[in-house]
């Protein structure tokens, strides 16, 4: 037989022979495949929509033109479904429901600055790159993802609030940021025209300093009683009719969320006490100082109470 029965055309590749003693001086055949200099990677549309802050291999020290800046993490047409509630519902306040062209440009710049502010406070909270026991993302597998979903849900509810509620929150956040600016005209101008940066600055300030009643625990029964009374009064003030409004409920939005949030709160209090005495004492001093600056500037009685009971001051800073 000339060839085996199972052999088909193209089954065996032809041998490519270079220069040998049996062949002529032919050009050697290169077996290496040519590759392009630019390596491209296909990114799924869903992954691109929910990407995190920042990208690997991008030099953020060299700013791009504002018109070429593209929003990452959510839709470029509106800031309605971001990663945190402080980014939501700021630029949808318009007579027709749609922001103007100038507002869209300012929206991009405001969000760009807010992301930078957020990164600064993250580095301040974790200066050595290692998270402490104060981290509140979760203690078991799956809780971190649940927290991210909860934050996006909170951002969605934040954008659904009435216009008067959102405006009141913007003006209150601006007032607090003016106080924390300590007379810096440049920061005051930024907080005046950039509501997203103001809300992010306020949230990052409280988070980095630890001025929250979740991490500042009462030292005795009397302090616990006073701090609980302050929290009850603030909740009653924000929900005067007894019915929680859209975006005001912090316990959850589905069955089982409330219990999971309570367990997470107790775990956060436990982890906060595992830090060094210097960190615990520093959070107490920062809570008292922050509450006096923002809420008790001219009342000597409240200042005395806030300096005496740090957990009460942290309850003021929470709401």
Curated annotation (Swiss-Prot):
Gene Ontology biological-process annotations: photosynthesis
Bilayer topology: Peripheral membrane protein
Main subcellular localisation: plastid
UniProt keyword terms in alphabetical order: Antenna complex, Bile pigment, Chloroplast, Chromophore, Electron transport, Membrane, Photosynthesis, Phycobilisome, Plastid, Thylakoid, Transit peptide, Transport
Stretch forming the transit peptide: 1-71
Binding locations of (2R,3E)-phycoerythrobilin: 212
Subcellular location: Plastid, Chloroplast thylakoid membrane
Residues the record lists as binding phycourobilin 1: 96
GO CC terms in record: chloroplast thylakoid membrane; phycobilisome
UniProt binding sites for phycourobilin 2: 135
UniProt PTM comment: Contains four covalently linked bilin chromophores.
Binding site residues for phycourobilin 3: 299
Description of how the protein assembles with itself and partners: Heteromer of 4 alpha, 4 beta and one gamma chains.
Protein name: R-phycoerythrin gamma chain, chloroplastic
């Amino acid at each position: 037989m000339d060839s085996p029965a199972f052999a088909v055309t193209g089954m065996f590749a032809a041998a490519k022979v270079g220069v040998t003693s049996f062949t002529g001086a032919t050009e050697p055949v290169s077996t290496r495949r040519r590759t392009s200099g630019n390596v491209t990677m296909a990114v799924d549309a869903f992954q691109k929509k929910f990407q995190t802050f920042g990208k690997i291999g991008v030099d953020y020290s060299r700013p791009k033109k504002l018109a070429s800046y593209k929003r990452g993490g959510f839709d470029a047409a509106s800031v309605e479904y971001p990663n945190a509630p402080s980014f939501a519902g700021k630029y949808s306040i318009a007579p027709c429901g749609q922001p103007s062209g100038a507002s869209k440009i300012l929206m991009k710049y405001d969000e760009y600055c807010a992301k930078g502010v957020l990164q600064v406070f993250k580095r301040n909270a974790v200066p050595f790159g290692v998270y402490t026991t104060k981290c509140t993302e979760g203690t078991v597998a799956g809780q971190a993802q649940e927290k991210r979903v909860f934050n996006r849900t909170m951002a969605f509810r934040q954008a659904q609030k009435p216009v008067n509620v959102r405006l009141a929150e913007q003006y209150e956040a601006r007032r607090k940021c003016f106080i924390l600016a300590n007379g810096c005209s440049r920061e005051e101008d930024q907080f005046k025209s950039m509501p997203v940066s103001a809300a992010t600055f306020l949230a990052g300030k409280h988070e980095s300093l630890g001025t929250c009643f979740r991490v500042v625990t009462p030292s005795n029964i009397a302090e616990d009683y006073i701090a609980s009374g302050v929290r009850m009064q603030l909740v009653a003030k924000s929900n005067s009719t007894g019915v929680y409004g859209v975006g005001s409920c912090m316990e959850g939005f589905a069955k089982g969320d409330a219990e999971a949030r309570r367990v997470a709160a107790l775990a956060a209090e436990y982890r906060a006490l595992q830090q060094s005495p210097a960190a615990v004492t520093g959070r107490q001093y920062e809570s008292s100082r922050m509450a006096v600056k923002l809420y008790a500037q001219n009342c000597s009685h409240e200042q005395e109470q806030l300096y005496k009971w740090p957990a009460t001051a942290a309850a003021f800073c929470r709401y």
